[in-house]
Amino acid sequence: MSTFRIALATTVMLAAMYGCATSELTNTWKDPKYGGGPVKKVMVVGISKQASVRRTFEDTFAEMLRAKGVEAVPSYTVVPEEGQMTEDKLRAAVKQSGADAVLITRMVEKQTDTQVSAPPPPIGAYRRTSYSGYYSSAWAGYYEPVTVQEFHYVVTETTLFVAEHPEPVWSGTTRTMESNDIRAATEGFAKPMIAAMKKEKLI
């Protein structure tokens, strides 16, 4: 499983992606050469510098996999140390857990969408009118400033490795809105991932 080096080369903080459960599966890929059936047990690995984030992510993702009939184990239950694991330690952890597959999630990039809301131009108040008419036209001409809203998203990549296969067998990319509710965001993020892997008969 030498390709773990690619997935583990960048230690990033998954904390940035977690928040509300707004998540979109934007792309998937499957190795056309892979002919194996569904995996039996998955080790879930979240790449994060924050131990609490990693644990919540791995726990939630593993729970959702188990809810779909897939045996899963969070990596921190085997390797509780914080920070990046060596490749040897990761391979030993996979063997110790009895998993035949590893699911690794990493952050790829942050994106910002900007939404500008421009109100209609104000209507000038009429000079030659009664006070009540002037009052009404004044409301019609009430000025609202242009509003600018920014929506922050994080793009993450989840890759499935099968222990006896030399290369990744599947990968999916999601775009998730930032927030602070780690568990809820992980649930929203994991749901389309699990559905896509089930569709491909990988889990």
Named regions from a protein language model:
Residues 1-8:
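Bacterial N-terminal signal peptides that target proteins for export
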Residues 85-160:
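Surface-exposed short loop/turn segments
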Residues 27-31, 56-67, 126-129, 202-203:
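Short low-complexity stretches enriched in small and charged residues
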Residues 41-115:
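N-terminal segment of the mature soluble domain
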Residues 20-41, 49, 143-203:
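C-terminal/domain-edge helix-coil "capping" segments
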